[in-house]
Regions:
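Metal-dependent peptidase/peptidase-like ectodomains
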Residues: 112-115, 127-128, 229-261, 373-479, ...
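Active-site-adjacent substrate-binding region
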Residues: 175, 195, 206, 264-267, ...
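Soluble metallo-hydrolase cores and metallopeptidase-like ectodomains found primarily
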Residues: 21-22, 101-105, 118-154, 235-339, ...
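Extracellular/luminal Protease-associated
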Residues: 23, 113-234, 305, 338, ...
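Noncatalytic luminal/extracellular "stalk/propeptide" segments of secretory-pathway proteins
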Residues: 47-172, 280, 424
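N-terminal hydrophobic or amphipathic helices/low-complexity stretches enriched
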Residues: 17-77, 97, 250-251, 257, ...
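Acidic/histidine-rich catalytic neighborhood of metal-dependent amide-processing enzymes
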Residues: 183, 189, 193, 209-210, ...
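Bacterial Sec-dependent N-terminal signal peptides
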Residues: 1-25
Length: 549
Protein backbone atom coordinates (compact mmCIF):
# COMPACT_ATOMS: atom_id res chain seq x y z
CA UNK A 1 0.00 0.00 0.00
CA UNK A 2 2.86 2.36 0.87
CA UNK A 3 4.35 1.75 -2.59
CA UNK A 4 0.99 2.48 -4.24
CA UNK A 5 0.68 5.73 -2.31
CA UNK A 6 4.20 6.75 -3.27
CA UNK A 7 3.41 6.02 -6.93
CA UNK A 8 0.16 7.97 -6.69
CA UNK A 9 1.71 11.13 -5.23
CA UNK A 10 3.70 12.07 -8.37
CA UNK A 11 0.53 11.58 -10.45
CA UNK A 12 -1.37 13.99 -8.21
CA UNK A 13 1.47 16.49 -8.44
CA UNK A 14 1.47 16.17 -12.26
CA UNK A 15 -2.30 16.74 -12.46
CA UNK A 16 -2.04 19.72 -10.10
CA UNK A 17 0.78 21.22 -12.17
CA UNK A 18 -1.16 20.76 -15.39
CA UNK A 19 -4.24 22.39 -13.84
CA UNK A 20 -2.12 25.27 -12.55
CA UNK A 21 -0.56 25.68 -16.00
CA UNK A 22 -4.00 25.82 -17.63
CA UNK A 23 -5.20 28.49 -15.21
CA UNK A 24 -2.00 30.49 -15.65
CA UNK A 25 -2.26 30.51 -19.44
CA UNK A 26 -6.01 31.18 -19.38
CA UNK A 27 -5.34 34.17 -17.12
CA UNK A 28 -3.31 35.73 -19.94
CA UNK A 29 -6.61 36.37 -21.72
CA UNK A 30 -7.35 39.86 -20.42
CA UNK A 31 -9.47 42.87 -21.26
CA UNK A 32 -6.39 44.50 -22.76
CA UNK A 33 -5.46 41.49 -24.91
CA UNK A 34 -9.01 41.28 -26.28
CA UNK A 35 -9.28 45.03 -26.90
CA UNK A 36 -5.95 45.08 -28.74
CA UNK A 37 -7.32 43.25 -31.79
CA UNK A 38 -10.76 44.89 -31.63
CA UNK A 39 -9.29 48.38 -31.74
CA UNK A 40 -7.38 47.51 -34.91
CA UNK A 41 -9.97 45.48 -36.82
CA UNK A 42 -12.82 47.88 -35.96
CA UNK A 43 -10.86 51.00 -36.87
CA UNK A 44 -11.82 53.17 -39.83
CA UNK A 45 -8.62 52.04 -41.58
CA UNK A 46 -10.28 48.66 -42.22
CA UNK A 47 -13.31 50.31 -43.87
CA UNK A 48 -15.87 47.98 -42.29
CA UNK A 49 -14.24 44.80 -43.68
CA UNK A 50 -16.81 44.35 -46.44
CA UNK A 51 -16.64 41.09 -48.37
CA UNK A 52 -14.48 41.36 -51.48
CA UNK A 53 -13.34 44.91 -50.68
CA UNK A 54 -10.06 46.61 -49.86
CA UNK A 55 -11.10 46.42 -46.21
CA UNK A 56 -11.26 42.64 -46.44
CA UNK A 57 -7.75 42.57 -47.91
CA UNK A 58 -6.46 44.72 -45.05
CA UNK A 59 -8.10 42.42 -42.50
CA UNK A 60 -6.65 39.31 -44.13
CA UNK A 61 -3.17 40.85 -44.10
CA UNK A 62 -3.54 41.71 -40.40
CA UNK A 63 -4.84 38.27 -39.47
CA UNK A 64 -2.08 36.39 -41.29
CA UNK A 65 0.52 38.56 -39.55
CA UNK A 66 -1.03 37.90 -36.13
CA UNK A 67 -1.26 34.17 -36.74
CA UNK A 68 2.39 34.01 -37.71
CA UNK A 69 3.34 35.95 -34.57
CA UNK A 70 1.36 33.49 -32.46
CA UNK A 71 3.34 30.66 -34.04
CA UNK A 72 0.48 29.04 -35.93
CA UNK A 73 1.13 27.41 -39.27
CA UNK A 74 -0.93 27.69 -42.42
CA UNK A 75 -4.07 25.59 -42.57
CA UNK A 76 -4.07 25.47 -46.37
CA UNK A 77 -1.76 23.39 -48.53
CA UNK A 78 0.08 26.24 -50.26
CA UNK A 79 1.26 27.72 -46.96
CA UNK A 80 -0.43 31.08 -47.54
CA UNK A 81 -3.05 30.85 -44.73
CA UNK A 82 -5.57 32.04 -47.36
CA UNK A 83 -8.45 30.03 -48.85
CA UNK A 84 -9.84 32.14 -51.72
CA UNK A 85 -13.37 31.54 -52.97
CA UNK A 86 -15.50 33.04 -55.76
CA UNK A 87 -18.84 34.72 -55.12
CA UNK A 88 -21.55 36.08 -57.36
CA UNK A 89 -23.52 39.16 -56.49
CA UNK A 90 -27.03 38.80 -57.95
CA UNK A 91 -29.69 41.48 -58.36
CA UNK A 92 -33.07 40.93 -59.99
CA UNK A 93 -33.62 43.80 -62.44
CA UNK A 94 -36.84 42.67 -64.13
CA UNK A 95 -39.62 40.37 -62.97
CA UNK A 96 -43.21 39.40 -63.62
CA UNK A 97 -45.51 36.71 -62.23
CA UNK A 98 -49.03 35.91 -63.34
CA UNK A 99 -51.71 33.31 -62.63
CA UNK A 100 -52.68 31.27 -65.68
CA UNK A 101 -55.62 29.02 -66.57
CA UNK A 102 -53.88 25.86 -67.71
CA UNK A 103 -56.79 24.58 -69.83
CA UNK A 104 -56.51 27.63 -72.08
CA UNK A 105 -52.87 28.66 -71.49
CA UNK A 106 -54.10 32.16 -70.76
CA UNK A 107 -53.12 34.60 -68.05
CA UNK A 108 -55.98 35.63 -65.79
CA UNK A 109 -54.25 37.74 -63.15
CA UNK A 110 -50.95 39.52 -62.55
CA UNK A 111 -49.04 39.88 -59.29
CA UNK A 112 -47.10 43.05 -58.48
CA UNK A 113 -43.38 42.73 -57.82
CA UNK A 114 -42.30 43.86 -54.36
CA UNK A 115 -45.88 44.36 -53.12
CA UNK A 116 -47.10 40.79 -53.81
CA UNK A 117 -43.99 38.76 -54.54
CA UNK A 118 -40.24 38.68 -54.83
CA UNK A 119 -38.41 36.13 -56.98
CA UNK A 120 -34.97 35.47 -58.41
CA UNK A 121 -33.16 32.92 -60.61
CA UNK A 122 -32.22 29.87 -58.53
CA UNK A 123 -29.50 28.52 -60.80
CA UNK A 124 -27.38 31.64 -61.36
CA UNK A 125 -28.97 32.17 -64.78
CA UNK A 126 -29.37 35.63 -66.28
CA UNK A 127 -32.91 34.99 -67.52
CA UNK A 128 -35.83 32.78 -66.50
CA UNK A 129 -38.94 32.32 -68.64
CA UNK A 130 -41.44 29.85 -67.17
CA UNK A 131 -44.77 29.47 -68.95
CA UNK A 132 -47.91 27.91 -67.45
CA UNK A 133 -46.15 25.86 -64.79
CA UNK A 134 -48.27 23.43 -62.81
CA UNK A 135 -48.51 24.10 -59.08
CA UNK A 136 -48.38 21.74 -56.09
CA UNK A 137 -48.90 22.76 -52.46
CA UNK A 138 -46.53 20.64 -50.34
CA UNK A 139 -47.30 21.88 -46.83
CA UNK A 140 -44.04 22.60 -45.00
CA UNK A 141 -42.07 20.87 -47.74
CA UNK A 142 -40.33 18.65 -45.20
CA UNK A 143 -38.96 15.13 -45.41
CA UNK A 144 -37.82 14.02 -41.96
CA UNK A 145 -37.60 10.24 -41.51
CA UNK A 146 -36.72 10.61 -37.81
CA UNK A 147 -40.10 12.34 -37.32
CA UNK A 148 -41.92 9.93 -39.65
CA UNK A 149 -42.79 12.98 -41.75
CA UNK A 150 -43.02 13.27 -45.54
CA UNK A 151 -44.76 16.20 -47.21
CA UNK A 152 -44.02 14.80 -50.68
CA UNK A 153 -46.05 11.60 -50.41
CA UNK A 154 -46.97 10.07 -53.75
CA UNK A 155 -46.25 13.19 -55.78
CA UNK A 156 -43.77 13.95 -58.52
CA UNK A 157 -42.89 17.65 -58.50
CA UNK A 158 -40.42 17.54 -61.37
CA UNK A 159 -41.16 20.37 -63.77
CA UNK A 160 -43.66 21.95 -61.36
CA UNK A 161 -43.57 24.94 -59.02
CA UNK A 162 -44.11 23.97 -55.39
CA UNK A 163 -45.89 26.27 -52.92
CA UNK A 164 -44.61 25.93 -49.36
CA UNK A 165 -45.77 26.91 -45.90
CA UNK A 166 -43.05 28.64 -43.89
CA UNK A 167 -41.54 27.34 -40.62
CA UNK A 168 -41.95 23.80 -39.25
CA UNK A 169 -44.76 22.15 -37.24
CA UNK A 170 -45.25 23.63 -33.76
CA UNK A 171 -48.45 21.94 -32.65
CA UNK A 172 -46.77 19.42 -30.30
CA UNK A 173 -43.64 19.79 -28.13
CA UNK A 174 -42.73 16.22 -29.04
CA UNK A 175 -42.80 16.88 -32.80
CA UNK A 176 -40.00 18.93 -34.41
CA UNK A 177 -39.08 20.22 -30.93
CA UNK A 178 -42.31 22.21 -30.65
CA UNK A 179 -41.80 25.96 -30.96
CA UNK A 180 -38.03 25.59 -31.38
CA UNK A 181 -37.27 26.39 -34.99
CA UNK A 182 -35.23 23.61 -36.55
CA UNK A 183 -33.46 23.75 -39.87
CA UNK A 184 -36.56 22.22 -41.44
CA UNK A 185 -38.25 25.56 -40.75
CA UNK A 186 -35.64 27.73 -42.44
CA UNK A 187 -36.27 29.07 -45.93
CA UNK A 188 -32.88 27.73 -47.05
CA UNK A 189 -34.03 24.18 -46.31
CA UNK A 190 -37.18 24.71 -48.38
CA UNK A 191 -35.22 25.83 -51.43
CA UNK A 192 -32.64 23.05 -51.02
CA UNK A 193 -35.41 20.46 -50.81
CA UNK A 194 -37.07 21.88 -53.93
CA UNK A 195 -33.82 21.43 -55.83
CA UNK A 196 -33.37 17.92 -54.44
CA UNK A 197 -36.90 16.95 -55.53
CA UNK A 198 -36.40 18.35 -59.03
CA UNK A 199 -38.99 21.13 -58.76
CA UNK A 200 -39.01 23.81 -61.44
CA UNK A 201 -39.55 26.50 -58.83
CA UNK A 202 -40.23 27.04 -55.15
CA UNK A 203 -42.38 29.76 -53.57
CA UNK A 204 -42.76 30.23 -49.82
CA UNK A 205 -45.98 31.71 -48.42
CA UNK A 206 -45.12 34.59 -46.11
CA UNK A 207 -47.00 35.28 -42.90
CA UNK A 208 -45.51 37.32 -40.09
CA UNK A 209 -46.20 34.64 -37.41
CA UNK A 210 -44.51 31.85 -39.39
CA UNK A 211 -41.56 34.00 -40.48
CA UNK A 212 -41.02 35.98 -37.31
CA UNK A 213 -40.69 39.18 -39.36
CA UNK A 214 -42.86 41.30 -41.62
CA UNK A 215 -43.14 41.31 -45.41
CA UNK A 216 -40.94 44.42 -45.55
CA UNK A 217 -37.96 42.34 -44.39
CA UNK A 218 -38.56 39.86 -47.21
CA UNK A 219 -39.26 42.43 -49.92
CA UNK A 220 -36.37 44.73 -49.01
CA UNK A 221 -33.90 41.90 -48.51
CA UNK A 222 -34.62 39.88 -51.64
CA UNK A 223 -35.00 42.85 -53.95
CA UNK A 224 -31.51 44.03 -53.02
CA UNK A 225 -28.28 42.43 -54.21
CA UNK A 226 -27.84 38.90 -52.86
CA UNK A 227 -24.78 36.71 -52.86
CA UNK A 228 -23.96 33.10 -53.67
CA UNK A 229 -20.92 30.89 -53.88
CA UNK A 230 -20.21 30.74 -57.59
CA UNK A 231 -20.97 27.40 -59.21
CA UNK A 232 -18.04 25.73 -60.94
CA UNK A 233 -18.15 25.76 -64.71
CA UNK A 234 -20.05 22.72 -65.90
CA UNK A 235 -21.36 21.90 -62.43
CA UNK A 236 -24.90 20.60 -62.04
CA UNK A 237 -26.87 23.63 -60.91
CA UNK A 238 -30.05 21.63 -60.54
CA UNK A 239 -33.37 21.85 -62.33
CA UNK A 240 -34.88 24.53 -60.09
CA UNK A 241 -35.05 27.73 -62.12
CA UNK A 242 -36.61 30.17 -59.66
CA UNK A 243 -37.18 30.73 -55.96
CA UNK A 244 -39.40 33.31 -54.35
CA UNK A 245 -41.83 34.48 -51.69
CA UNK A 246 -45.52 35.34 -52.00
CA UNK A 247 -47.55 37.42 -49.56
CA UNK A 248 -50.42 35.85 -47.67
CA UNK A 249 -52.92 37.98 -49.60
CA UNK A 250 -51.49 37.05 -52.99
CA UNK A 251 -51.33 33.39 -51.94
CA UNK A 252 -54.97 33.45 -50.91
CA UNK A 253 -55.90 34.85 -54.31
CA UNK A 254 -53.87 32.15 -56.06
CA UNK A 255 -55.52 29.31 -54.13
CA UNK A 256 -58.99 30.76 -54.63
CA UNK A 257 -58.42 30.55 -58.39
CA UNK A 258 -57.99 26.81 -57.91
CA UNK A 259 -61.12 26.56 -55.75
CA UNK A 260 -59.11 26.01 -52.57
CA UNK A 261 -59.17 27.66 -49.15
CA UNK A 262 -55.66 28.72 -48.15
CA UNK A 263 -56.37 28.84 -44.42
CA UNK A 264 -57.67 25.27 -44.44
CA UNK A 265 -54.60 24.10 -46.32
CA UNK A 266 -52.21 25.91 -44.00
CA UNK A 267 -53.88 24.21 -41.07
CA UNK A 268 -53.84 20.81 -42.77
CA UNK A 269 -50.03 20.97 -43.02
CA UNK A 270 -49.78 20.45 -39.25
CA UNK A 271 -50.21 16.69 -39.51
CA UNK A 272 -47.94 13.80 -40.48
CA UNK A 273 -50.89 12.58 -42.58
CA UNK A 274 -50.76 15.66 -44.82
CA UNK A 275 -50.82 14.89 -48.54
CA UNK A 276 -49.72 17.28 -51.32
CA UNK A 277 -52.45 19.19 -53.13
CA UNK A 278 -52.38 19.96 -56.85
CA UNK A 279 -53.84 23.35 -57.79
CA UNK A 280 -56.12 22.14 -60.59
CA UNK A 281 -56.23 24.11 -63.81
CA UNK A 282 -54.14 26.84 -62.15
CA UNK A 283 -50.56 27.67 -63.01
CA UNK A 284 -47.96 30.41 -62.91
CA UNK A 285 -45.94 32.14 -65.57
CA UNK A 286 -42.75 33.78 -64.36
CA UNK A 287 -40.20 35.94 -66.18
CA UNK A 288 -37.04 37.11 -64.45
CA UNK A 289 -33.87 38.87 -65.44
CA UNK A 290 -30.87 39.30 -63.16
CA UNK A 291 -27.50 40.98 -63.34
CA UNK A 292 -24.36 39.55 -61.75
CA UNK A 293 -20.95 40.67 -60.61
CA UNK A 294 -17.96 38.54 -59.65
CA UNK A 295 -16.44 38.92 -56.18
CA UNK A 296 -13.22 37.38 -54.91
CA UNK A 297 -13.39 36.65 -51.19
CA UNK A 298 -10.93 35.06 -48.77
CA UNK A 299 -11.03 32.84 -45.71
CA UNK A 300 -8.04 32.65 -43.37
CA UNK A 301 -7.12 29.18 -42.08
CA UNK A 302 -4.43 28.38 -39.49
CA UNK A 303 -3.29 25.37 -37.50
CA UNK A 304 -1.50 24.47 -34.28
CA UNK A 305 -0.37 20.87 -34.35
CA UNK A 306 -1.12 18.52 -31.48
CA UNK A 307 1.53 16.46 -29.71
CA UNK A 308 -0.01 12.98 -29.83
CA UNK A 309 1.10 10.93 -32.83
CA UNK A 310 -2.22 9.07 -32.91
CA UNK A 311 -4.51 12.08 -32.42
CA UNK A 312 -2.79 15.07 -34.02
CA UNK A 313 -4.64 14.45 -37.28
CA UNK A 314 -7.90 15.23 -35.44
CA UNK A 315 -8.93 18.83 -34.79
CA UNK A 316 -10.71 21.25 -32.53
CA UNK A 317 -12.22 23.72 -34.99
CA UNK A 318 -12.43 27.35 -33.86
CA UNK A 319 -14.42 29.59 -36.18
CA UNK A 320 -15.19 33.30 -36.34
CA UNK A 321 -16.15 35.61 -39.18
CA UNK A 322 -14.03 38.70 -39.72
CA UNK A 323 -16.20 40.41 -42.35
CA UNK A 324 -18.79 43.09 -41.71
CA UNK A 325 -20.92 45.42 -43.85
CA UNK A 326 -18.21 47.69 -45.23
CA UNK A 327 -19.03 51.20 -46.42
CA UNK A 328 -22.70 52.12 -46.85
CA UNK A 329 -24.87 55.22 -47.19
CA UNK A 330 -23.71 57.85 -44.66
CA UNK A 331 -25.67 58.28 -41.44
CA UNK A 332 -24.89 61.59 -39.72
CA UNK A 333 -21.72 61.76 -41.80
CA UNK A 334 -20.47 58.26 -40.93
CA UNK A 335 -20.47 55.63 -43.68
CA UNK A 336 -18.16 52.98 -42.17
CA UNK A 337 -19.78 49.99 -40.47
CA UNK A 338 -16.91 49.20 -38.11
CA UNK A 339 -18.33 45.94 -36.75
CA UNK A 340 -16.67 46.10 -33.33
CA UNK A 341 -19.04 43.73 -31.56
CA UNK A 342 -19.93 41.94 -34.81
CA UNK A 343 -17.38 40.50 -35.17
CA UNK A 344 -14.01 42.04 -34.36
CA UNK A 345 -14.76 40.93 -30.80
CA UNK A 346 -15.22 37.26 -31.72
CA UNK A 347 -12.09 37.24 -33.88
CA UNK A 348 -10.10 38.71 -31.01
CA UNK A 349 -11.30 36.02 -28.62
CA UNK A 350 -10.32 33.37 -31.18
CA UNK A 351 -6.81 34.83 -31.53
CA UNK A 352 -6.43 34.95 -27.75
CA UNK A 353 -7.53 31.33 -27.38
CA UNK A 354 -5.21 30.26 -30.18
CA UNK A 355 -2.27 31.99 -28.51
CA UNK A 356 -3.00 30.06 -25.33
CA UNK A 357 -3.16 26.72 -27.14
CA UNK A 358 0.19 27.46 -28.79
CA UNK A 359 1.73 27.93 -25.35
CA UNK A 360 0.23 24.60 -24.29
CA UNK A 361 1.27 22.83 -27.49
CA UNK A 362 3.21 20.03 -25.72
CA UNK A 363 0.11 19.29 -23.62
CA UNK A 364 -2.54 19.20 -26.36
CA UNK A 365 -3.09 15.86 -28.06
CA UNK A 366 -5.24 16.94 -30.97
CA UNK A 367 -4.52 19.85 -33.28
CA UNK A 368 -6.33 23.19 -33.40
CA UNK A 369 -7.72 24.45 -36.70
CA UNK A 370 -8.85 28.07 -36.91
CA UNK A 371 -11.14 29.12 -39.75
CA UNK A 372 -11.51 32.90 -39.75
CA UNK A 373 -14.06 33.29 -42.49
CA UNK A 374 -15.44 36.03 -44.70
CA UNK A 375 -18.89 36.56 -46.24
CA UNK A 376 -20.85 35.65 -43.10
CA UNK A 377 -22.86 38.83 -43.35
CA UNK A 378 -23.99 38.01 -46.89
CA UNK A 379 -25.25 34.50 -46.15
CA UNK A 380 -22.67 32.47 -44.16
CA UNK A 381 -20.88 31.92 -47.46
CA UNK A 382 -17.27 31.72 -46.25
CA UNK A 383 -18.07 28.90 -43.85
CA UNK A 384 -20.29 27.28 -46.49
CA UNK A 385 -17.34 27.25 -48.86
CA UNK A 386 -14.99 25.81 -46.23
CA UNK A 387 -17.51 23.12 -45.25
CA UNK A 388 -17.88 22.08 -48.89
CA UNK A 389 -14.14 22.40 -49.53
CA UNK A 390 -12.65 21.44 -46.15
CA UNK A 391 -8.93 21.74 -45.58
CA UNK A 392 -9.00 18.62 -43.38
CA UNK A 393 -11.27 15.54 -43.53
CA UNK A 394 -14.63 16.36 -41.95
CA UNK A 395 -14.63 13.13 -39.97
CA UNK A 396 -11.40 14.24 -38.31
CA UNK A 397 -12.92 17.41 -36.82
CA UNK A 398 -13.64 16.66 -33.17
CA UNK A 399 -15.93 19.64 -32.60
CA UNK A 400 -16.52 23.31 -33.42
CA UNK A 401 -16.67 26.35 -31.14
CA UNK A 402 -17.99 29.30 -33.13
CA UNK A 403 -17.14 32.77 -31.85
CA UNK A 404 -19.60 35.30 -33.28
CA UNK A 405 -19.65 38.25 -30.93
CA UNK A 406 -18.87 38.07 -27.24
CA UNK A 407 -20.08 39.61 -24.00
CA UNK A 408 -18.93 43.23 -24.19
CA UNK A 409 -21.22 44.57 -21.44
CA UNK A 410 -19.87 43.02 -18.25
CA UNK A 411 -19.77 39.79 -16.28
CA UNK A 412 -22.74 37.47 -16.00
CA UNK A 413 -23.41 34.72 -13.51
CA UNK A 414 -24.73 32.43 -16.23
CA UNK A 415 -23.60 31.13 -19.61
CA UNK A 416 -25.78 30.80 -22.72
CA UNK A 417 -24.95 28.47 -25.57
CA UNK A 418 -26.80 28.02 -28.82
CA UNK A 419 -26.79 24.26 -29.27
CA UNK A 420 -27.45 23.52 -25.60
CA UNK A 421 -28.18 19.85 -24.91
CA UNK A 422 -27.59 18.72 -28.49
CA UNK A 423 -24.12 17.20 -28.31
CA UNK A 424 -21.38 15.90 -26.05
CA UNK A 425 -19.58 19.17 -26.81
CA UNK A 426 -22.44 21.12 -25.26
CA UNK A 427 -22.24 18.77 -22.27
CA UNK A 428 -18.57 19.72 -21.79
CA UNK A 429 -19.61 23.37 -21.45
CA UNK A 430 -21.97 22.41 -18.63
CA UNK A 431 -19.23 20.43 -16.89
CA UNK A 432 -16.65 23.22 -17.11
CA UNK A 433 -19.11 25.98 -16.16
CA UNK A 434 -20.32 23.97 -13.17
CA UNK A 435 -16.75 23.88 -11.84
CA UNK A 436 -16.81 27.67 -11.52
CA UNK A 437 -20.40 27.91 -10.32
CA UNK A 438 -21.95 29.20 -13.53
CA UNK A 439 -25.28 27.74 -14.69
CA UNK A 440 -25.58 27.08 -18.43
CA UNK A 441 -28.80 28.09 -20.16
CA UNK A 442 -30.24 27.38 -23.60
CA UNK A 443 -31.29 29.99 -26.11
CA UNK A 444 -34.10 32.07 -24.62
CA UNK A 445 -35.72 32.53 -28.05
CA UNK A 446 -35.61 29.14 -29.79
CA UNK A 447 -38.37 30.20 -32.18
CA UNK A 448 -35.88 32.56 -33.86
CA UNK A 449 -33.73 29.66 -35.07
CA UNK A 450 -30.43 31.24 -34.01
CA UNK A 451 -28.65 27.91 -34.38
CA UNK A 452 -29.00 28.28 -38.14
CA UNK A 453 -27.85 31.89 -38.40
CA UNK A 454 -24.10 31.80 -37.81
CA UNK A 455 -21.13 29.93 -39.22
CA UNK A 456 -21.31 26.91 -36.92
CA UNK A 457 -24.47 25.91 -38.78
CA UNK A 458 -22.51 25.09 -41.93
CA UNK A 459 -20.19 22.97 -39.80
CA UNK A 460 -23.18 21.17 -38.29
CA UNK A 461 -24.65 20.51 -41.75
CA UNK A 462 -21.60 18.43 -42.61
CA UNK A 463 -21.79 16.61 -39.29
CA UNK A 464 -19.42 18.49 -36.99
CA UNK A 465 -20.81 18.87 -33.42
CA UNK A 466 -20.93 22.63 -32.91
CA UNK A 467 -21.80 25.24 -30.31
CA UNK A 468 -22.28 29.00 -30.49
CA UNK A 469 -21.56 30.79 -27.17
CA UNK A 470 -23.79 33.77 -26.41
CA UNK A 471 -23.63 36.33 -23.59
CA UNK A 472 -25.37 35.32 -20.41
CA UNK A 473 -28.42 37.22 -19.20
CA UNK A 474 -27.89 37.52 -15.44
CA UNK A 475 -25.49 40.46 -15.26
CA UNK A 476 -23.50 41.13 -12.11
CA UNK A 477 -23.76 44.58 -10.55
CA UNK A 478 -26.11 46.11 -13.10
CA UNK A 479 -29.60 47.39 -12.35
CA UNK A 480 -32.63 46.55 -14.45
CA UNK A 481 -32.65 50.12 -15.81
CA UNK A 482 -28.99 49.88 -16.77
CA UNK A 483 -29.61 46.62 -18.61
CA UNK A 484 -32.59 48.06 -20.46
CA UNK A 485 -30.38 50.92 -21.64
CA UNK A 486 -27.62 48.52 -22.71
CA UNK A 487 -30.10 46.27 -24.53
CA UNK A 488 -31.51 49.28 -26.34
CA UNK A 489 -28.07 50.56 -27.33
CA UNK A 490 -26.92 47.12 -28.48
CA UNK A 491 -30.05 46.59 -30.60
CA UNK A 492 -29.74 50.05 -32.16
CA UNK A 493 -26.05 49.50 -32.97
CA UNK A 494 -26.53 46.09 -34.59
CA UNK A 495 -25.65 46.18 -38.29
CA UNK A 496 -25.21 49.94 -38.25
CA UNK A 497 -22.41 52.49 -38.42
CA UNK A 498 -22.71 52.75 -34.63
CA UNK A 499 -21.27 49.27 -33.94
CA UNK A 500 -18.17 50.76 -32.35
CA UNK A 501 -16.54 50.58 -28.93
CA UNK A 502 -18.62 52.84 -26.68
CA UNK A 503 -18.96 53.93 -23.07
CA UNK A 504 -21.15 50.94 -22.19
CA UNK A 505 -18.48 48.38 -23.05
CA UNK A 506 -17.05 46.29 -20.21
CA UNK A 507 -14.87 43.40 -21.38
CA UNK A 508 -14.72 41.66 -18.00
CA UNK A 509 -17.51 39.40 -19.22
CA UNK A 510 -15.69 38.64 -22.46
CA UNK A 511 -12.63 37.62 -20.47
CA UNK A 512 -14.63 35.37 -18.17
CA UNK A 513 -16.34 33.64 -21.09
CA UNK A 514 -13.17 33.36 -23.19
CA UNK A 515 -11.32 31.65 -20.35
CA UNK A 516 -14.20 29.23 -19.89
CA UNK A 517 -14.36 28.26 -23.55
CA UNK A 518 -10.57 28.02 -23.69
CA UNK A 519 -10.89 25.25 -21.10
CA UNK A 520 -13.79 23.65 -22.97
CA UNK A 521 -11.55 23.58 -26.03
CA UNK A 522 -8.82 21.86 -24.02
CA UNK A 523 -11.30 19.17 -23.05
CA UNK A 524 -12.00 18.56 -26.75
CA UNK A 525 -8.29 18.50 -27.56
CA UNK A 526 -7.46 15.91 -24.91
CA UNK A 527 -10.63 13.79 -24.72
CA UNK A 528 -10.47 10.07 -25.41
CA UNK A 529 -13.01 10.40 -28.22
CA UNK A 530 -14.17 13.03 -30.69
CA UNK A 531 -17.45 14.79 -29.90
CA UNK A 532 -20.84 13.48 -31.05
CA UNK A 533 -24.39 14.67 -31.59
CA UNK A 534 -26.87 13.13 -29.20
CA UNK A 535 -28.95 10.32 -30.65
CA UNK A 536 -31.80 11.57 -32.81
CA UNK A 537 -30.36 15.03 -33.45
CA UNK A 538 -31.06 16.37 -36.93
CA UNK A 539 -27.32 16.40 -37.71
CA UNK A 540 -26.47 12.95 -36.35
CA UNK A 541 -26.84 11.31 -39.77
CA UNK A 542 -24.38 13.78 -41.33
CA UNK A 543 -21.87 13.00 -38.58
CA UNK A 544 -22.18 9.27 -39.12
CA UNK A 545 -21.75 9.80 -42.85
CA UNK A 546 -18.54 11.77 -42.29
CA UNK A 547 -17.26 8.91 -40.13
CA UNK A 548 -18.25 6.35 -42.79
CA UNK A 549 -20.70 4.70 -40.40
Amino acid sequence: MRKLILLFIPLLVLVACQSSNVDEIASEITEESIMDHISVLASDEFEGRGTGTRGEDKAVEYLVKQLKEIGATSGVADGSFIQPFPLLGQKTVSSSMGITRLSRNTQVSQFKYFDDFVAWPANQAEKVDIKNAELVYVGYGIQAPEENWDDFKDVDVKGKIIIIKNNDPEYDENVFAGKTRLYYGRYTYKYEKAKEMGALGAIIIHTTPTAGYGWNVVSNGWSSENFYVKSDAGADKGSTEMNGWLTYGASKKLFERAGLDLDDLLESADSPDFEPVVLKNTGLSVKLEAKYRNINAKNVVAKIEGSDDDLKDEYLLLSAHFDHLGITTPVDGDSINNGAEDNAAGVSVLLNMLKGYKKMQPDIKRSVLATIVSAEEVGLLGSEYWANNPTVPLGKVAGNINLDGTNVYGETKDVVIIGYGRSTLADLVVEEATKVGRPVKPDAHPEQGLFYRSDHFNMAKVGIPAIFPNPGTNYIGKTADEMRTIDSVSAANYHSVNDEVNEYWDLSGAVKDARLFFKVGLRVLNADDIQAWHAGDEFEAARLKSLNK
